[in-house]
Amino acid sequence: MESTPKKAPRSKFPALLVVALALVALVFVIWRVDSAPSTNDAYASADTIDVVPEVSGRIVELAVTDNQAVKQGDLLFRIDPRPYEANLAKAEASLAALDKQIMLTQRSVDAQQFGADSVNATVEKARAAAKQASDTLRRTEPLLREGFVSAEEVDRARTAQRAAEADLNAVLLQAQSAASAVSGVDALVAQRAAVEADIALTKLHLEMATVRAPFDGRVISLKTSVGQFASAMRPIFTLIDTRHWYVIANFRETDLKNIRSGTPATIRLMSDSGKTFEGKVDSIGYGVLPDDGGLVLGGLPKVSRSINWVRVAQRFPVKIMVDKPDPEMFRIGASAVANLEPQ
């Protein structure tokens, strides 16, 4: 009987090599994920402002369309300036009339001031006369008892003293009248300052009727047209600040230990995943709303009981500034993938 030949034992080296390579690859992937975190839970974003008119009026010119790119200083829209132009003309006319009134009043005041100076001199003269009459009466009255003067002479002295006092009072009233006339110009000058303030405010309102782009951006959410009445402080549309784009990437809290402000990043947008953009970490979020607890009632946190032994890492937003964004690709809310390279 012929004996069957024994099969040669298979070598285990290739299988061991494959297992070893798989382990090495697994270790590399784990190290890479831990040292260079990546996430596809990210989106592009930019700062926005609501474009609001600061004055009310009907829109007479709308220089932009929805989703249009604009440059700083470009005209966005114009509100009917005619009411503000009329207010400005009215205020300027009031100022001109007030200037004429001040000029005429000043002439009158100058004349009254000259008269007031004359009255002041008359006051001093009347005061001296009244003093002299009082002194004469004071000297004459004792002489009547001695018989050196007659009663008639004393009466004349009293009459002279009373007349001098009356003259003095009349002159004092004239002086007060002249002083009040001078103060009337001060009131007109103050009124002129108020009119000038009205003119400045009206010019500002007229300037505000023309709204221009405060920075390079893109118009969105435009839902109005010429003829619409615009109310002050009510948004007309939104303007995206396209000068600075950034990506909000939500990383697991276990990935945050090596992430710092300035950490280099590589960004890809899903609209064109073959193109990459460089960036740097700007900041890391310090607060998110938890999904399953933390409700505060009466000052004490209410924590729900849990029998779930699997803990899912919380994600925190990381803001990544993009160095040279493509203005045609970046849109607010665009899906992105972020890869970080901690140093």
Swiss-Prot record:
Single GO biological process annotation from the record: response to antibiotic
Disulfide bond positions: none
InterPro entries in the cross-refs: CusB-like_dom_1 (IPR043602), CusB_D23 (IPR032317), MFP_Efflux_Pump (IPR050393), MFP_proteobact (IPR005694)
Record's subcellular location: Cell inner membrane
GO cellular component: plasma membrane
Protein's membrane topology: Single-pass type II membrane protein
Side of membrane Cytoplasmic, spans: 1-12
Keywords from the UniProt entry: Antibiotic resistance, Cell inner membrane, Cell membrane, Membrane, Signal-anchor, Transmembrane, Transmembrane helix, Transport
UniProt-recorded Gene Ontology molecular function terms: xenobiotic transmembrane transporter activity
Gene3D superfamilies assigned: 2.40.30.170, 2.40.50.100, Helix hairpin bin (1.10.287.470)
Periplasmic side: 34-343
Pfam families: CusB_dom_1 (PF00529), HlyD_D23 (PF16576)
TM stretches of this protein: 13-33
Assembly and oligomerization: Could be part of a tripartite efflux system composed of MdtN, MdtO and MdtP.
PANTHER family in the cross-refs: MULTIDRUG RESISTANCE PROTEIN MDTN, P-HYDROXYBENZOIC ACID EFFLUX PUMP SUBUNIT AAEA-RELATED
Described purpose of this protein according to its UniProt entry: Could be involved in resistance to puromycin, acriflavine and tetraphenylarsonium chloride.
NCBIfam families per the UniProt record, alphabetical: 8a0101, PRK10476.1
Family, as annotated: Belongs to the membrane fusion protein (MFP) (TC 8.A.1) family.
Name listed for the protein in its UniProt record: Multidrug resistance protein MdtN
Annotated source species: Escherichia coli O6:H1 (strain CFT073 / ATCC 700928 / UPEC)
Taxonomic lineage: Bacteria, Pseudomonadati, Pseudomonadota, Gammaproteobacteria, Enterobacterales
